[in-house]
């Protein structure tokens, strides 16, 4: 089952046109706001969220729990080599965790079935899928029955952040809901 969905402004705009994405988001066990635009829209509509939950922070906290609980984690997505680097850097910072496996986000249908089998056979408890919106959400949804009970979440470009390929905004910008401006500056 898709355990959680991190929803930002881009995803909300896309799901108005993409009915499959809208369906997936409406059937996640947990949907959390990832972006100042979502918080602002909630305020305007009278729905106040306690806080923004940045994908990078959320994934890091889930991984810390996985370290403590010894949950096997599978990293799926990113460019070749990115997931491995993200795993290495996280391990250097927080200690080793059970790795169910990893695969980049580039694969064909034959490889796809091998990946699903690897996720299952590795005893995966946490599946981080970083293939970008809406591909990651749809992929997780389309494979949820095959994958069985696993905390699966789309994490977008989080592997690049974890690997050190993409810097996050300074903390003061994040605290003032300006991370979007920093990302726009870095990736116009």
Functional labels for PLM-detected ranges:
Residues 1-8, 12-13:
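Single conserved hydrophobic/aromatic residue that forms the stacking wall/gate
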Residues 9-10, 131-136, 158:
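Short glycine-rich anion-binding loops that position phosphate/pyrophosphate groups of nucleotides
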Residues 20-41, 48:
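Active-site cofactor/substrate anionic-group-binding motifs, chiefly glycine-
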Residues 23-27, 137-157:
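A short, gly/pro- and small-residue-rich
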Residues 29, 73, 100, 125, ...:
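Conserved acidic residues
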Residues 39-118, 122:
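Conserved beta-alpha
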Residues 104-110, 150-186:
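Short, flexible loop segments at boundaries between secondary-structure elements
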Residues 119, 123-133, 149:
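Proline-aspartate-enriched helix->loop->beta-strand connector
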